[in-house]
Amino acid sequence: MGVFNYETETTSVIPAARLFKAFILEGDTLIPKVAPQAISSVENIEGNGGPGTIKKITFPEGSPFKYVKERVDEVDHANFKYSYSMIEGGALGDTLEKICNEIKIVATPDGGSILKISNKYHTKGDHEMKAEHMKAIKEKGEALLRAVESYLLAHSDAYN
């Protein structure tokens, strides 16, 4: 098994606390609402949302995958940090054992935020992750962020 790391940063005009609340803490209900073309639903299979919780993310018809299951590893409200692992489903395929993800949202002096994202791909056997595959995953995550950001800009009273 190999482990391939991919780190990226992206900025948002939304303040860190508000973005953490909307994108991370309430994302299970907000993201299917603002990006139904990407995610149909998110349901807790086990747990209450904290560490150890297992979530099932269902994708819309026509998507390359039907679902994935994720395990919440850490929710740090004080530092706007969230860690989770993708543990089952189509996105892992025959080549990945799991994907461990960490998102940390940092406030910027201008009132916006920076999302620092770390992904660790745990491969099966001697499989290697291709840069274009990791880039495609980053672009999908960025699209979800922009959908949430647009919603928050249009609804200034939401998730404060």
From Swiss-Prot:
<dbReference type="GO" id="GO:0004864">
    <property type="term" value="F:protein phosphatase inhibitor activity"/>
</dbReference>
<comment type="similarity">
    <text>Belongs to the BetVI family.</text>
</comment>
<dbReference type="GO" id="GO:0005634">
    <property type="term" value="C:nucleus"/>
</dbReference>
<feature type="binding site">
    <location>
        <position position="55"/>
    </location>
    <ligand>
        <name>brassinolide</name>
    </ligand>
</feature>
<dbReference type="GO" id="GO:0009738">
    <property type="term" value="P:abscisic acid-activated signaling pathway"/>
</dbReference>
<keyword id="KW-0568">Pathogenesis-related protein</keyword>
<keyword id="KW-0963">Cytoplasm</keyword>
<feature type="binding site">
    <location>
        <position position="84"/>
    </location>
    <ligand>
        <name>brassinolide</name>
    </ligand>
</feature>
<dbReference type="GO" id="GO:0006952">
    <property type="term" value="P:defense response"/>
</dbReference>
<dbReference type="InterPro" id="IPR024949">
    <property type="entry name" value="Bet_v_I_allergen"/>
</dbReference>
<dbReference type="InterPro" id="IPR023393">
    <property type="entry name" value="START-like_dom_sf"/>
</dbReference>
<dbReference type="GO" id="GO:0010427">
    <property type="term" value="F:abscisic acid binding"/>
</dbReference>
<dbReference type="InterPro" id="IPR050279">
    <property type="entry name" value="Plant_def-hormone_signal"/>
</dbReference>
<protein>
    <recommendedName>
        <fullName>Major pollen allergen Bet v 1-B</fullName>
    </recommendedName>
</protein>
<dbReference type="InterPro" id="IPR000916">
    <property type="entry name" value="Bet_v_I/MLP"/>
</dbReference>
<dbReference type="GO" id="GO:0005737">
    <property type="term" value="C:cytoplasm"/>
</dbReference>
<feature type="binding site">
    <location>
        <position position="82"/>
    </location>
    <ligand>
        <name>brassinolide</name>
    </ligand>
</feature>
<comment type="function">
    <text>May be a general steroid carrier protein.</text>
</comment>
<keyword id="KW-0020">Allergen</keyword>
<dbReference type="Pfam" id="PF00407">
    <property type="entry name" value="Bet_v_1"/>
</dbReference>
<feature type="binding site">
    <location>
        <position position="101"/>
    </location>
    <ligand>
        <name>brassinolide</name>
    </ligand>
</feature>
<dbReference type="GO" id="GO:0038023">
    <property type="term" value="F:signaling receptor activity"/>
</dbReference>
<keyword id="KW-0611">Plant defense</keyword>
